[in-house]
Amino acid sequence: MTKALFYLIFFLALFGNTFFLYGFLPEPLAVTTEISIILLFAIAILSKIGRGQVPRWHLFPGFLMICFVAACSMFFNQTEPVRAVFSLRLLYRFYFLYLALINLDLDEKTLKKFNFYLLILLVGQLPVVAYKFYHQGIAETTMGAYGRGGSLTAMLPVAMIFYMSAYYFLEKPRKLYLIIGLGFIFFSIVGAKRAVLFFYPIEFLAIYYFIYCKGKQVDPFRKAGVLILSIFMIGIVSASILYFNRTLNPEQKVGGSIDPAYALSYAIDYNTRENELGYTTGRFSTTRRIFSVLYNDGVSRLFFGFGPGAYTVSILDPQGSHRQIYQLEKRLGIGYGVTSMNRIALEYGVLGVVAFALIPIAFCFICRRQYRLETDPYWRAFAGGSMGFAFAMLAFFVIYHFPAFWGDTLPALYFYAMAVVYIRSRKANQTSVQQ
């Protein structure tokens, strides 16, 4: 039962939206993921209690804190309770998947089966991207089978490249890992994602230092050849992005000239600009505008935001909630660039941001610690990839699009990976105590 629910949750996370879009599955089944998580959570907790054991509630104080913040925000903003429930449900549903997984006492064999299943689903995105590329060319709609959420075309490859690099350097240098990694670089380029121009150089240098040098205990000054190769790889990939992305070259076409100065100027303007009506259309300008309004509106607004659900579409009243979001955007003067941090700030204020940020920050520390302690090559590679994933998600939380934590796909993968690292860390702690 638990395995079937797991397989269903992640199949829907990576392929479900395409099935809904083309009518292979009826739209009401879109709530199947949440029902499956509830069932899995209930099975895990009740099984734990049935064996006379205390369930693990890792990071649960952060959830209680945001519930308290939500209650205060509802009071100050006169928000309907149902809107708060819908908002918290979307934000924390995969955290409860995390709690379910860490309470199921999954053994190593089962975890490896789950990892392999997810690898198949993730690699299965590449043929879908190739098919869409054949029919659509280089475009933001050239994405995987998850069907929506264009920003995933940048974030998902970043995560996969961390894992493939870790397994190549720390487990076994299989060519398959390189091929999959290159496939996801292709994935992001044909998906026309500008952000990877800046993500990849940082990621490749992080892989070189933290996974290759630290992981293999190599002196970076004695392996300058690998560093040179990394820099060369950064140059090739960056040049390819500039050449193929219409918005990053002066000619505004696929196959334009490679002009880093133009691309940098465009990126700065893109992230800081406002349109002719004064609406912010960049992530940095939108972040500045949101926190400026929260600050200027007084202490209660700064701490508790505009109310849970203020920026969330309700399935009970989609038209009404869309109008509410439009009015809020009009009041703030924002048009584009809402990050996960921004969205939480809008609904829950600064205290909500602090409460939720405890999760990605804690996961960074857990992954870093486990990466240092893990001795098994397979699991050390997993910990190394997860460390990269955790720090990337912390960055996405602050500076990138909100599907990083509010979506259907990446949060499922993220909380699964963090659950596995936590399970391994518990096992390591138990082993050290026994010794």
Each model region followed by its residue ranges:
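Transmembrane signal-anchor hairpin modules in multi-pass inner-membrane enzymes, especially those
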Residues: 1-71, 106-112, 116, 166-175, ...
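Hydrophobic, aromatic-rich transmembrane alpha-helices
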Residues: 36-51, 159-169, 353-374
